[in-house]
Regions:
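Extracytoplasmic/periplasmic/luminal assembly and interaction segments
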Residues: 66-108
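N-terminal Lys/Arg-rich, disordered targeting/topogenic segments
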Residues: 1-8
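Long, internal scaffold/assembly segments composed of regular secondary structure
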Residues: 249-341
Length: 467
């Protein structure tokens, strides 16, 4: 392809909430490089390139899943049970909701949230909650609505008898996504056919049972990577203890491997009572760790509450195997867990609570990335909602939570945790949150659940281009 001094070729690559514009003017750039400018004779002329505003998209987890149809047949296909409630927020004018199509393996009817582009690229956020009681599928599950990405760490799940873990792979893009699953358990890396080259068609979701790759694994971690289209990955775990429902929840993606991890919001509610009865070994609260490197990690787990109380637990995590650190004798409350490690780790937490009818519910709580100075979020309606802020930085922070004309300012001291009751189903704008990590917990008669508050999506800004 050729250019002339007066011709300009523009290529615009559109993506989720970002846009990149590349401008080439061959003759003009060559001349400027040779003669400079009047104001700076020795400096090549530059050009400011402004990205084209793009729509913002996030994908929610969808509804609860069962590996059968309504009649209990076809255990190779996932079918939905009930409907999740979704709350949304945007800095734009509106949020459009649509669904991704199910594949041959079924689907959770995930919601695609789209904030159309305006004069600038908007932000969009959301979360979902579902309380379900259908046969042996009972409990509360919550999840964040997430940006598509090429890498997701799912810290949670089990394939022991009575435990069903389903990975959902949602592709909101217009190209095929080729997905690889790196699966780890307490023995190390799971080597099984079918974990690589999983094709997820554009604008569809594929459901992948974890038991298809590994059986009788008490503790699992899954690293989901994709090429081509980007993916939003979640994991649903359901538990049946003999014949008694043992809970349901959704594992949201956690923070990437790091020597410092924060699980900002964990709910503990009568965990000792949840461990009574048969087949209850996995009802105890734990922090799950995985070291993806080659060296053992010395880990310190800091456990704190908003009233300033807390404890420290020391552990060792061997490389390449999943480690569960038991948390015994902690009173009921809303906690934050801070993990410091000598090697990069990923982390998540699980707790269990009694529910009506002698059942239990489990909750999985993901680690989270630090927020920027301003973030929007929306919390799906549910019982016993709290918003947790954790300040892992060395400086105190003044955080403002605004909903419409209402606002509240909180002092979050360095190293401290603050818990706040908040309105649900309304847009919340969080400011002053640079370096803060935040999460949401639910605690009620239906069980416990939670999700991390996601940072604002990175948006391209104007750049100065020189030859």
């Amino acid at each position: 392809m050729s250019t002339t001094p007066s011709s300009v070729r523009r290529w615009v690559v559109r993506g989720t909430a970002t846009a990149v514009a590349v401008v080439v003017a061959a003759g003009a750039v060559t001349a400027a490089h040779a003669i400079g400018t009047d104001s700076d004779p020795g400096r090549p002329a530059g050009r400011t390139v402004t990205p084209v505003p793009a729509a913002a998209e996030r994908v929610c987890a969808g509804s609860a899943l069962r590996l059968s149809d309504d009649a209990g047949n076809d255990a190779t296909q996932a079918s939905t049970v009930g409907t999740a409630t979704v709350a949304t927020a945007t800095t734009g004018s509106t949020v459009e909701r649509s669904s991704l199509d199910a594949s041959t393996t079924g689907g959770s009817d995930p919601r695609l949230l789209t904030a159309p582009a305006g004069e600038t690229t908007p932000q969009v956020a959301g979360s979902s909650l579902q309380s379900v009681s259908s046969g042996d599928l009972v409990g509360a599950g919550a999840a964040s609505c997430d940006d598509p990405t090429q890498s997701t760490w799912l810290v949670g799940g089990s394939t022991e008898t009575g435990r069903t873990s389903l990975i959902t792979l949602s592709n909101p893009t217009d190209v095929n996504a080729t997905v690889d699953l790196a699966i780890f358990d307490g023995s190390g890396t799971v080597n099984a056919p079918g974990t690589t080259g999983i094709v997820v068609a554009p604008n569809t979701q594929k459901v992948v049972p974890l038991s298809g790759f590994v059986s009788d694994a008490a503790s699992t971690v899954v690293h989901v990577t994709s090429s081509g289209g980007q993916i939003v990955a979640h994991m649903q775990e359901t538990v049946v203890r003999t014949l008694t429902p043992g809970g349901y929840d959704i594992v949201s993606g956690g923070a990437a491997p790091s020597r410092a991890q924060v699980i900002p919001a964990v709910a503990l509610a009568d965990a000792q009572a949840a461990q009574r009865g048969d087949d209850a070994a996995d009802a105890a609260p734990i922090v799950r760790l995985f070291v993806p490197g080659t060296k053992s990690a010395r880990v310190t787990l800091g456990i704190s509450t908003a009233d300033g109380s807390g404890a420290t637990v020391n552990a060792t995590a061997e490389p390449g195997v999943v480690t569960d650190v038991a948390l015994d004798d902690f009173p009921d409350g809303r906690y934050s867990f801070t993990v410091t490690s000598t090697e990069p780790v990923v982390a998540g937490a699980r707790s269990t609570t009694p529910t009506e009818g002698n059942g239990t519910d489990l909750g999985w709580f993901a680690s989270a990335e630090p927020l920027g100075d301003e973030t929007i979020t929306a919390i799906a309606p549910g019982e016993g909602v709290r918003l947790n802020f954790v300040n892992p930085t060395r400086e105190d922070r003044s955080v403002t939570v605004r909903s419409g004309d209402e606002r509240r300012t909180l002092k979050v001291l360095s190293g401290a945790t603050v818990t706040l009751p908040v309105q649900t189903a309304k847009q919340l704008t969080l400011t002053g949150t640079e370096g803060i990590v935040a999460g949401v917990t639910y605690r009620g008669a239906d069980g416990i659940a939670g999700f991390p508050v996601r940072p604002a999506t990175d948006v391209s800004t104007p750049v100065r281009v020189y030859p």
